[in-house]
Design a protein with these regions (language model features):
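M14 metallocarboxypeptidase catalytic domain recognition
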Residues: 2-438
């Protein structure tokens, strides 16, 4: 297994974890992303009629806006809360149109560049430098996360084993942490992945937080000790490694993978529409330039194929699949591709109900929960549905904070409360697994 760091550089590989905070991405000349988002706006509107819906879809398509919520024009209907990023050269045209058409809207972000600078600017760099160790309350680059994994693999070998399940389209390792006490050869397991969609940075932040809490509270928390003694956790902090890296270097709001298309100049596939379950049906697009592009065929993306292969081999062992996204404050379970009740609905629904109540107990944050198709929207080819269809009885997708005030730019100040409350939900689901549900 090739580990991160310079080939042959033993000294670099043995740097203590506390020095990794110095190896961080710092804005050049004070501007992130070459100031490309200066003047861009994020607006929210709700179509009030079918006429407004069709008119908005048409103008959105013409102006090439970036939909934040929902993820596709096909999901917009009367009453749908719609958040979108409007480039500065289109914002005046769109706002004038909305005013003339008497369509109500709210400006959530008046200057996106300023919002980005505020979220991940020089304050973050200072925080990273000043912390005595790894700071779990800031966002980290892919290199930092992989180095963090490597260090934990060395310093906590009694609980953690790091390995690669393959390579991404651009050749990056797909690292996974196996977390748990090696008390016996076979134990049931839970799979957790974060960062399927590149721009949803709070996902990877939670995966890191989960590992931190596990290793720090194993001795002091009876529930955590029971979880790690009786289960293994396979944790993939960054699923879409190429896209996540690209969201740090080039486009903060990139969603897809980074694979190339032979017929179009557009890059990437929606890694949550690329699974072999009702592939490229409702809620997915055949067009390579769309954010919900399903790919040329199921598992076309090496990242998806690698995870699917890993889960298939362990389908008898893995009893829960948890995937972390943003944003909406929801806990979703199958089905996503159809309106139907899953066979073990009562057990799954009970686990979801208890999880969202546990989450709310921390800070009063309310999450909606239910089948993805009716709670969020219908989408085909999702990892959650695939996991359930392949014999994993508890399959959930979290949509973490918030509900749109910050959207994908959730401030670093909210990482701790978001992860703290989510931790309660995940522990609740895990403890539910350890009991028999009838």
């Amino acid at each position: 297994m090739k580990l991160p760091g310079s080939p042959g550089s033993r000294g670099a590989a043995l740097l203590p974890l506390c020095l990794l905070v110095l190896k961080t991405w710092v804005p050049v000349q004070g501007y992130l992303y070459n100031n490309r988002y200066a003047g861009d706006k994020v607006i929210r509107l709700v179509p009030g009629s079918e006429r407004e819906t069709q008119a908005l879809k048409s103008v959105f398509h013409q102006l090439k806006v970036d939909l934040w919520q929902p993820s596709s024009l096909s999901y917009i209907s009367e009453g749908t809360v719609t958040d979108l990023r409007v480039p500065r050269n289109s914002s005046q045209v769109l706002l004038s149109y909305l005013q003339q058409a008497n369509i109500q809207y709210t400006i959530l972000v008046s200057d996106l560049q300023q919002a980005i600078e505020k979220q991940t600017g020089l304050r973050s760099s200072r925080n990273r430098r000043s912390m005595p160790g790894y700071n779990y309350e800031v966002y980290h680059s892919l290199k930092e996360i992989q180095n963090w994994m490597y260090q934990l693999n060395k310093t906590h070998s009694d609980l953690i084993h790091m390995f690669s399940i393959g390579k991404s389209y651009e050749g990056r390792q797909l690292f996974v942490l196996k977390l748990g006490k090696r008390s016996r050869r076979y134990k049931r397991a839970v799979w957790i992945d974060c960062g399927i969609h590149a721009r949803e940075w709070i996902g990877p932040a939670f995966c890191q937080w989960f590992v931190k809490e596990a290793i720090q509270t194993y001795q002091s928390d009876p529930a955590m000790r029971r979880m790690l003694n009786q289960l293994y956790f396979y944790i993939m902090p960054v699923f879409n490694v190429d896209g996540y890296h690209f969201s740090w270097t080039d486009d903060r709001f990139w969603r897809k993978t980074r694979s190339k298309n032979s017929k179009f100049r557009c890059h990437g596939v929606d890694a949550n529409r690329n699974w072999k379950v009702k592939w490229c049906d409702e809620g997915a697009s055949f067009h390579p330039c769309d954010d919900t592009y399903c790919g040329p065929f199921p598992e076309s993306e090496p990242e998806v194929k690698a995870v699917a292969h890993f889960l298939r081999k362990r389908r008898k062992q893995i009893k829960a699949y948890l995937s972390f996204h943003a944003y909406a404050q929801m806990l979703l379970y199958p089905y996503s591709y159809k309106y139907a009740t899953i066979p073990n609905f009562s057990c799954v629904e009970s686990a979801a109900y208890k999880a969202v109540n546990a989450l709310q107990s921390a800070y009063g944050i309310r999450y909606r929960y239910g089948p993805a198709s009716s709670t969020l929207y219908v989408s085909s080819g999702s990892s959650m549905d695939w996991a359930y269809k392949n014999g994993i009885p508890y399959a959930f997708a979290f949509e973490l904070r918030d509900t749109g005030h910050f959207g994908f730019l959730l401030p670093e100040a909210l990482i701790k409360p978001t992860c703290t409350e989510t931790m309660l939900a995940v522990k609740n689901i895990t403890m539910h697994l350890l009991k028999k549900c009838h």
